Amino acid sequence: MALVDLVRAGGYSIEYPQFSSMAKLKEFPHSEDGKLVRLLSWHEGVGLGGGLFKVSTSSTATGNDGTVVVASNGVRLLRVVNGPIWADMFGALPNSDIDSMPAVAAAYAYAASVNTDLYIGVATYKFKGSTPINIDPSRAGIIGYQGKVRIDCSEFTGSIVFSINSSYSYTPAAYYNNLSPALQGLYVLGAKTSGVDGLLVGRETVGADKSYNGQTEIRECTFDKFDRNIRMGHNSWRFVFYKVNSLNALSPNGILYVPAGLDDSGEILSFYHCQFFDGAGSNIRLSCSSYTMVFNTCSFLNITFFVDSASSATVTCNGCNFENPGSASTRRYVDISAGHTNVFNIIGGSIVTNSNPGQTQALLYVSTNNLLNLVGVTVPYGGHYQQEQELGYHAFIGGAGTVTASGVMLQLRNGAGTCPLHSSLSTFSNWDFGYGNLNAWTVDKGAGTSSVVEYLANAGPKGTGGAMRVAPVSVGTNVSQVQAVTNPGMFSMSCMVNIATTSGNAGQISIGFLDAAGNSIPGGVSANLGTTTGWKVIGKNTLRGKVPIGAKQIRVNVQTVAGADVKYAYLLCNVVK
């Protein structure tokens, strides 16, 4: 009885009326000011959303059916709140026939008004209607309990389910306190409905004031099957995504979309342990200039990361995984295809290509005046690599931009072979006969003065680009070039060859090394041309190796036997370290 006496001494009664549902609580004509009543359940017989309410005959507060209830006679009942705010207090119910969105929206509005987070209990909830929930990270977030809350938005018809944007601006003084998650622990599922997006990060329209969104965090959430799962808006800067997944979107840009022209946006968007997956044609696209994104130990699965910003976008992937699990489609992983001064860094991590009928695209692509940096990665290779079908030559990376490589490993013991990285790393001058002649190449016809060694325009594998035709008459012909090289390092070379006629093996391409005095040293390799006619790749599993210790020069020699008629194009060799 001591506990009962203590409760009564505190001004509370333990003999108070009980109501089985919110509807019955509102129907009763409450009139005794200060009286405590108990709501057993918001919905009849469910056991969720109950609690103590205190009758207030003087209150004129607006009812929200959660913390302020207006009875049938107009009297207010005020919820006794002494802990976290839960969505079920406002009528949210894990039931596929009940639209819980109005309840969650009302619960969040109250939580934000008192600067505390809203919690949603473990279950699956249905969201219908068309009005988004706008989250103000400076005031309150929405947290799914234990990270196991599922929200079914398959019948939602609005343009956005959730948007995140602070009500605080830079002036007169920023709140500087977006330290609790704006969203956490939610699996938000759509139905691939056109025009319905899962999450807008930032503002939909440009405002005269600037929202202070720094340090806003989205944690342990999944957005699945929306038109665009995650879309960046105006004032999107210094947002943090931790263990966020974006899966199976409808739009070609639906996995993660950063549109052009965003106002006051792009200062360090950070992603940690996130997963981006599709496989049906939806991708990541960064189109906004001066936008910086950093991905740490994230996975990019069966998607392409497009960068078509007009200028100055920067993407850094630290320890990330690029892969095509379970896919039979040829796919590019990174495509920097427009603008200028865009930078994409791949630092550590893994690049994996599971076998498919034919990898006919270069895995990575960087257009002119843009930069792709590879640091501390192993370059994969497979027998299904057929990048020459797209590029006209055999290389891991396509495009006319610039590639740098530091601490990069070639798979020299891969039975399928290796390939050079990129044309900008070419060891040899005029590797593609792009000078419009054979300059930089030394021709040795020997005694066969009538042998043909000539430049041909628009004669490459795709009917464009230059080629070198060699047709020795009486003795074989050698075409060679020597360039400086440093060690340690690894080399890989590929060459496109088209044999028109030959009576046997048409010749050989060899790579050798010289010391500082010009003496040959061990470590060279060679590849026979064979007899097969038509354009083909030479060097996949033969023209590769380590630069030997002491090497100061690298020499390539193209030998064509007498009686053969061969075209050569794109003699691409890279030395990386």
From Swiss-Prot:
Subcellular location: Virion
Keyword Protein biosynthesis attached: no
Hydrolase as UniProt keyword: no
Keywords: Degradation of host capsule during virus entry, Degradation of host cell envelope components during virus entry, Host-virus interaction, Viral attachment to host adhesion receptor, Viral attachment to host cell, Viral tail protein, Virion, Virus entry into host cell
Coiled-coil segments: none
Location (main, coarse): virion
GO BP term, pick one: symbiont entry into host cell via disruption of host cell envelope
Gene Ontology cellular component terms for the protein in this record: virus tail
Record's function text: Functions as a receptor binding protein (RBP) and mediates the attachment to the host capsular exopolysaccharides. Displays a depolymerase activity that specifically degrades the K2-type polysaccharides of Klebsiella pneumoniae capsule.
Subunit structure: Homotrimer.
Record-stated family: Belongs to the K2-specific depolymerase family.
Annotated protein name in UniProt: Depolymerase, capsule K2-specific
Species: Klebsiella phage vB_KpnP_KpV74
